[in-house]
Amino acid sequence: MKKTAAIISACMLTFALSACSGSNYVMHTNDGRTIVSDGKPQTDNDTGMISYKDANGNKQQINRTDVKEMVELDQ
């Protein structure tokens, strides 16, 4: 039941953020999380980190090896 609620919450967050201006990207991690970024994430090839701005406008980083898939949301 908790897994279903988490999936529904992630979908709702994705649709809510897709209404914002600009291109948003969704990153699916290896541990099952879904991260929605505001704008296109930047990959640093030297460090292997992906930098992105989260839904609250805070800059975040995640290791590239932790990201399974990254796709642009359709507007």
Swiss-Prot record:
Lipid moiety-binding residues (S-diacylglycerol cysteine): 20
Predominant location category: membrane
Q: List the GO terms this entry assigns under cellular component, sorted alphabetically.
A: plasma membrane
Q: Where does the signal sequence lie?
A: 1-19
- Record keywords: Cell membrane, Lipoprotein, Membrane, Palmitate, Signal
This protein's record includes keyword Cell membrane: yes
What kind of membrane protein is this, topologically? Lipid-anchor
Presence of the UniProt keyword Aminoacyl-tRNA synthetase in the record: no
Report what the protein is called: Uncharacterized lipoprotein YgdI
Native organism is Escherichia coli (strain K12)
**Organism classification, top ranks?**
Bacteria, Pseudomonadati, Pseudomonadota, Gammaproteobacteria, Enterobacterales
